[in-house]
């Protein structure tokens, strides 16, 4: 599929968002409105107009959405999409902190895994309580 046919599948508002000049873009819309399709088209448009895929960072709320976006762009562009990065907001922030912890006042920090979280939770709450971690939502 060519970039023109991909853009041709979008409505007017989606096409405007997909073809914005090389600048940051925030796509906010309700469920089922075509956000993913628009973001895929935007990434494909940027790559097809000369932006290296490695210079594009796509943010998504879930890992599934981030993975789906990258897979769809690769499906449309093939090797040109190599290096495209999409991640969750959390993963992106963790990446930034790992790269420059001193900027965030986090030098020497450690991220703990779920087992360590449970052990800490038990110590704080008391071992006789439930072993279930609270829902993070």
Question: In which residue ranges do the predicted regions lie?
Answer:
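P-loop NTPase Walker
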Residues: 1-104
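ATP-hydrolysis module of ASCE/P-loop NTPase motor domains
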Residues: 21, 77, 81-84, 102-137
């Amino acid at each position: 599929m060519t970039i023109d046919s991909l853009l041709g599948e979008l409505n007017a508002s989606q096409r405007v968002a997909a073809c914005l000049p090389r600048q940051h873009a925030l796509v906010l819309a309700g469920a089922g409105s075509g956000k993913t399709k628009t973001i895929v088209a935007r990434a494909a448009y940027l790559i097809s107009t000369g932006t290296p895929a490695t210079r594009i960072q796509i943010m998504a709320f879930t890992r599934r959405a981030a993975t789906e976006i990258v897979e769809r762009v690769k499906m449309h562009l093939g090797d040109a999409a190599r290096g495209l990065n999409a991640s969750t907001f959390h993963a992106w922030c963790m990446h930034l902190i790992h790269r420059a912890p001193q900027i965030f006042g986090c030098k020497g920090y450690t991220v703990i895994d779920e087992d360590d979280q449970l052990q800490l939770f038990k110590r704080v709450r008391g071992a006789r309580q439930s072993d279930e971690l609270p829902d993070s939502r």
